[in-house]
Amino acid sequence: MLSVIGIGPGSQAMMTMEAIEALQAAEIVVGYKTYTHLVKAFTGDKQVIKTGMCKEIERCQAAIELAQAGHNVVLISSGDAGIYGMAGLVLELVGKQKLDVEVRLIPGMTASIAAASLLGAPLMHDFCHISLSDLLTPWPVIEKRIVAAGEADFVICFYNPRSRGREGHLARAFDLLAASKSAQTPVGVVKSAGRKKEEKWLTTLGDMDFEPVDMTSLVIVGNKTTYVQDGLMITPRGYTL
């Protein structure tokens, strides 16, 4: 059997019991090397197969083949495996190859939920996730989604906001949003949510400093009703108070 699990943003406290139990029961754990380090408390003397960045297909294929061979295998993703994780790729590979292998999907806490809880309550109304990584999605497509989300006044959670190879993508996203959102729109940033180097801060669309943002960051841009009170970012649900 192959269990594809989300381990949350990094803290053991943010892992689900189902994910922990799957790790404890597994014979073999497969994952990106950084993520396998985050769950080492549960892997003990189990066989751990680590791969680097941009090896997602190889990682999933290895996990599938081990499960086919009769092993109890866990494939880990950070956050939730079904949100920019390995769940979809595993199902695609199994389907395309017409394999008879049992796949179990175990949810985890995605970064936007963890970040929102640290910032206040910014996701109380409609929101969307947009990844700024153009490795698998053409940048013009991403730009169209940013514009549409801004015009629809969604609260927007930006994943993969900035890296050494994509230093300008987040700034470009904010430029696009400036056409539909006020410069005073609250923005919250959380780095390394649930990990030792966790940081968070609030700013605005117009005052955003992009330099500290990296791939461990989650950026939340509010909607027209979002405000900051006592250092907390709040998007009203719409109750009459």
Model-found features: residue ranges?
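A contiguous loop/helix-start segment that scaffolds small-molecule binding in enzyme catalytic cores
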Residues: 2, 73, 151-241
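Class I S-adenosyl-L-methionine
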Residues: 1-103, 109, 114, 209
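Short histidine/acidic/glycine/proline-rich micro-motifs that form metal-
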Residues: 80-81, 133-136, 161-164
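Short gly/ser/thr-rich secondary-structure transition/capping motifs
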Residues: 7-14, 137-139, 200-203
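Class I SAM-dependent methyltransferase SAM-binding "motif I" and its flanking Rossmann-like core
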Residues: 85-152
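A polyampholytic, Gly/Pro-enriched intrinsically disordered region
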Residues: 71-77, 121-132, 150, 206-214
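Short, well-ordered secondary-structure micro-motifs
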Residues: 42, 86-87, 115-117, 140-142, ...
